[in-house]
């Protein structure tokens, strides 16, 4: 690549990382250096853990973090549990038909989330699921399931069909073939699916603010603190919200292979 391309990449990376740098300033630098006077090219004048310690010792913030963690983990597990049979069934269909059905599954993600969230909130209020962990997880699964099915479809399509055929010839039934042959080979893709779904839930906002207003998750609480002018606590919470995503992004590079994504696009 030419020097101009390298310069362009450096500028792009700096542009993308600058918001994280400002977040670092507000979260770790004493307030007198940030809230009162924050400059675009400012260097950290001092480092303090006071803001982060204050956020982590706040019971409301701890409760929101635990709620986000619980909901995200539940969404990840549901995505795997529902995505495996969905994607495995799709992998047995002709590729064009599987692609068409996958596109239909993504239709829910194409609509504005608030269009779906309002009728769900009304239904959950009647079912006793409003402002509950399970209710919020089920709603967020509408977003996560198409993604998990898409990734797992690519995973199953990347497994050689000869292995399944040989197992069937040896007398293995459908479920035995799935659990003893297919799933062990797909474990990395399943792990990637769980992580992707977990991340989708971890920072999801629209369903959380409409379906869990009394017991908010981290994104909702950050919004509330920001609108009330509590920027230091909001910055510390944003840092807590961002850190797992950065770690999981690195892990996804290990588990998510190119053929998994490519497989879901065949047809």
Spans of model-derived segments:
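N-terminal signal-anchor/first transmembrane alpha helix
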Residues: 1-28, 89, 99-105, 242-251, ...
